[in-house]
A protein has these predicted regions:
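Polytopic transmembrane helical bundles with strong interfacial aromatic enrichment
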Residues: 2-247
Length: 247
């Protein structure tokens, strides 16, 4: 069937999207495994030792992708929460709910690896730096989104309330990104920039970008897996879910 003739709106229904998500998950999971495997190899065995930080810098191959994904996932979560709020789309709200735990995990991973990197670099596990503090606020926003959603029994009212919180929290994302430019911070500037040539070795940059692709694939696979679970939970009283779980 030509792509132009496919009725894409049919996949806005949880019942229609559920099997599609199931078919996509293995492909994203395999891609995540391959990209992360190659990224780890490049980061640990191919990339040279940094002249200033020695071997300690290698945590960048986890820290930077996790930090990037913490912001990307939040923007995606807020976007789908907003779509669900404006258009009353159940699947969009479910997707926002499914993205939240993955985003929280990415944020925690960024903070944890940042602490491990900061100890040999700054001499402290934590400093109240503008970027670190705003990243911590991002973690609290994820936790607040999940907690608020879980605290309200009515799913539709929970979707609306959590969506408002997610949309308000979007203002924190540019603060995280531009904090090193707006304030005098300990945190280094952007590792990759579109306006200037990279300051790191090519193998370092390649390893970090490959790991980032792996993290992208992982986040998509994890969100789709959790979305399927959310669909089954929210639609458990429907006939089609009863047929699925009885197989």
């Amino acid at each position: 069937m030509p792509v132009s003739r496919i009725n894409w709106f049919q996949y806005a229904a949880p019942q229609s999207f559920y099997p599609v998500a199931g078919r996509m998950i293995p492909w994203f999971a395999i891609a995540a495994t391959l990209f992360c495997g190659v990224g780890v190899y490049l980061g640990l065995w191919v990339a040279p030792t940094d002249a200033q930080q020695g071997e300690a810098y290698r945590i960048i191959f986890v820290h930077v992708p996790a930090a990037w994904m913490s912001m990307v996932v939040y923007l995606a979560m807020a976007f789908w929460a907003g779509v669900g709020l404006v258009f009353n789309s159940r699947l969009s709200s479910m997707l926002a709910t499914a993205l939240a735990p993955t985003g929280a995990w990415m944020t925690f991973l960024a903070l944890w690896t940042g602490a491990l990197w900061g100890k040999p670099t700054w001499g402290a596990w934590w400093v109240w730096d503008a970027r670190l503090t705003s990243e911590l606020v991002l973690l609290f926003l994820y936790i607040g989104f999940m907690s608020l959603h879980a605290a309200i029994d009515d799913p539709r009212r929970a979707d609306r309330s959590a969506a408002l919180l997610a949309l308000v929290g979007v203002v924190n994302v540019p603060i995280i990104y531009f904090s090193v430019k707006w304030w005098n911070t300990l945190h280094q500037g952007a590792s990759v920039s579109l306006t200037r040539s990279p300051s790191m070795a090519t193998t370092m940059l390649l390893g970090m970008l490959v790991m980032t692709l792996g993290f992208w694939m992982y986040c998509i696979a994890a969100a789709l897996f959790r979305l399927r679970t959310t669909i089954l939970e929210r639609e458990r009283h429907t006939a089609w879910v009863q047929r699925v779980v009885s197989v």
